[in-house]
Curated annotation (Swiss-Prot):
GO terms of biological process kind: base-excision repair, AP site formation via deaminated base removal
Functional summary from the UniProt entry: Excises uracil residues from the DNA which can arise as a result of misincorporation of dUMP residues by DNA polymerase or due to deamination of cytosine.
Gene3D superfamilies listed in its UniProt record: Uracil-DNA glycosylase-like domain
UniProt name for this protein: Uracil-DNA glycosylase
Length: 230
C-alpha cells in the first residue's frame, strides 16, 4: 500500500486527496522523516502532528474557496492545522484573525464568534491552507524552505485543474506567489495585503473578500459559501 493510501486509511488525509497529492508522495514521506529527525534532536514544532495535514482532511471535490496563509501561528496551543484558525480556547485572538473578523463584520454584517476556531468554513467548502505546514515555536517562518512549499503548491495546482469553480483568496506576498499555478478559466483570484496588524490598513480593510467570493461563485455557476460562524 502506498504512503498516501496509508495516510488516508489512518484518517490523516481524505481519500479523495490521494490522487491529487500523488506527485509529491515521496516529498510528504520525506517531510515526515525530517520532522521525526528534528524531534529526536529535541526540536519541537507546531501544530501537533495529528493536525499538520488537517487541511487535507476534507474532500478534494468539495473545495470551492481557497484561503492561503503563510505558516502556522508560532505560539504553543494556537495552531490547529488550518490557516488563520486557532484552538477554540485561545484568548486573546491573534491580531491577523482579529482583523479578519473586523472585515467579516464589515463585509457581511455578521457578528463573529468570541473564539477563533473557523474550522466550520472547512466543512462548507473553504480550504484553509498554509504555504508552510509547520513552524518552530516562537520563530515565525522558521520552516520556510524545509520542503512544504512544493507540496502545497502541488495541492493548489490540482485544485485549479479541476473542471469546477474555485475562488482563491490570496492575502499577502507569500500567498500571491501561487498565482502562476492558478491560471484557469474556472478559477477567480481575490488578492489583497495580509490581514496582519502591520499591513491590514493598507488594503485589507474594505476589500470585502467574503461577499466578493460569493459573487464570483454565483457568476461561475456555483453555490455561495455560508460564512456564518455563530
Amino acid at each position: 500500500m502506498g504512503y498516501l493510501h496509508v495516510l488516508a486509511q489512518r484518517g490523516v488525509i481524505h481519500a479523495t486527496w490521494v490522487s491529487a497529492l500523488e506527485p509529491v508522495s515521496s516529498n510528504l514521506a520525506a517531510m515526515g522523516d525530517c520532522l521525526r529527525s528534528l524531534r529526536s534532536k529535541g526540536e519541537s514544532f507546531l501544530p501537533a502532528p495529528r493536525n499538520i495535514l488537517r487541511a487535507f482532511r476534507y474532500p478534494f471535490d468539495s473545495v470551492r474557496v481557497l484561503i492561503v496563509g503563510q505558516d502556522p501561528y508560532p505560539t504553543q496551543g494556537h495552531p490547529i492545522g488550518l490557516s488563520f484558525a486557532v484552538d477554540h480556547k485561545v484568548r486573546p485572538l491573534p491580531g491577523s484573525l482579529q482583523n479578519i473578523y473586523t472585515e467579516y463584520r464589515s463585509d457581511l454584517n455578521l457578528d463573529p464568534p468570541q473564539h477563533g476556531d473557523i474550522s466550520l468554513w472547512s466543512e462548507r467548502g473553504v480550504m484553509l491552507l498554509n504555504r508552510t505546514l509547520t513552524v518552530r515555536p516562537g520563530i515565525p517562518s522558521s520552516h520556510r524552505g524545509l520542503g512544504w512549499e512544493e507540496i502545497t503548491q502541488t495541492a493548489v495546482r490540482a485544485l485549479a485543474a479541476r473542471d469546477v469553480p474555485l475562488i482563491a483568496i490570496l492575502w499577502g506576498r507569500h500567498a500571491q506567489e501561487l498565482k502562476s499555478v492558478l491560471q484557469s478559466d474556472r478559477v477567480a483570484i481575490l488578492e489583497s495585503v495580509h490581514p496582519s496588524p502591520m499591513s491590514a490598513t493598507r488594503g485589507f480593510f474594505g476589500s470585502k473578500p467574503f461577499s466578493k467570493a460569493n459573487d464570483l461563485l454565483r457568476d461561475l455557476g456555483s453555490a455561495p459559501i455560508d460564512w456564518r460562524l455563530t
